[in-house]
Amino acid sequence: MNKILIIDDEKDICYLISEILHDEKYITESVSNSSEAIKKLETFRPDLIILDVWLGPNSELDGIELLKKIMTINSLIPVIVITGHGTVDMAVNAIKNGAYDFIEKPFNSEKIIILSKRAIESAKLADENKLLKKIAHPNTPLIGNSSFIII
């Protein structure tokens, strides 16, 4: 089962997203601020993070700053950024800083489901591709030196 970390200061939003994703058989954990999120990443290895841009006054970092921090911890985890106060510039900024995608509140549950599946699948394919490159790289000289290859 895939695991998703939800980071939002609004408990109702965390609950709603969790319920949507539980119906799709995802395991979810929720936190409400940046320090809890960083701590949770040490023990809960998510396949996806859903991150609100505005994390409220009790958060040391806002969502974009936390996104940057997450990218330094593990840039392979896809992050979907959500916000109720979105602009095109904010979406572009989030994606420039490593977000997989950007969703505005209020959101459609179908969109959360589709983007979550796509983000996780994309990350898995990237991992597999990385592994294949590692396997292929040491064998590359063998191909170039083989006397059985006719060009």
Predicted features by range, described:
Residues 44-50, 55:
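Active-site beta3 strand of CheY-like receiver
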Residues 133-151:
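AAA+ ATPase active-site-proximal loops
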Residues 11-29:
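Two-component/phosphorelay signaling modules centered on CheY-like receiver
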Residues 25-34, 40:
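Short hydrophobic/Thr-rich beta-strand motif most characteristic of the beta2 strand and flanking loop
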Residues 87-89, 107-116:
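C-terminal output helix
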Residues 8, 52-54, 83:
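Active-site residues of response regulator receiver
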Residues 39, 54, 59-75, 93:
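Short amphipathic alpha-helix used as the core "switch/output" element in two-component signaling
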